[in-house]
Regions:
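Intrinsic disorder/low-complexity segments
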Residues: 7, 20, 38, 45, ...
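Aromatic/hydrophobic beta-strand junction motif of beta-rich domains
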Residues: 19-24, 81-83
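Generic detector of ordered secondary-structure context
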Residues: 24-25, 73
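Beta-sandwich interaction modules
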Residues: 1-14, 49-101
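Short beta-strand/loop motifs in extracellular/secreted proteins, especially
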Residues: 17-19, 27-32, 89, 93-95
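Non-cytosolic beta-sandwich-type ligand-binding/adhesion modules
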Residues: 25-67
Length: 101
């Protein structure tokens, strides 16, 4: 599957991490909020990152348009977002990801 990974975002180590994510046009895939406790995590090194929360859209759960939130209290120094596209001919898209901590 094709996937996109955001750049890393410096976070407040022990605070709530909130993200608002908007998808549209029947997006099929997985959106994941990831964190890292490393001082200098590498974008390409998956072992530097752990999953905080995931939202999955498949044929049964896809929607024309939706905004949802991740809201988790996690101890980490960095945050990033990843989305994986599950269909080769997909028309759906992730419109925006807004992050606050």
């Amino acid at each position: 599957y094709d996937y996109y990974v955001s750049s890393r975002i410096k976070s407040d180590e022990s605070d709530y991490h909130t993200a608002s994510v908007t998808v549209k046009n029947n997006f099929l895939g997985t959106i994941t909020m990831e964190g890292s406790a490393d001082v200098n995590p590498q974008e390409a090194n998956e072992s530097d990152w752990f999953v905080i929360d995931t939202k999955d859209y498949d044929d049964e759960t896809k929607v024309d348009e939706e905004t949802f939130q991740f809201n988790k209290q996690v101890n980490c120094m960095w945050i990033r977002f990843k989305y994986t596209i599950k269909a080769a001919n997909q028309q759906g898209e992730v419109v925006e990801i807004l992050y606050r901590n």
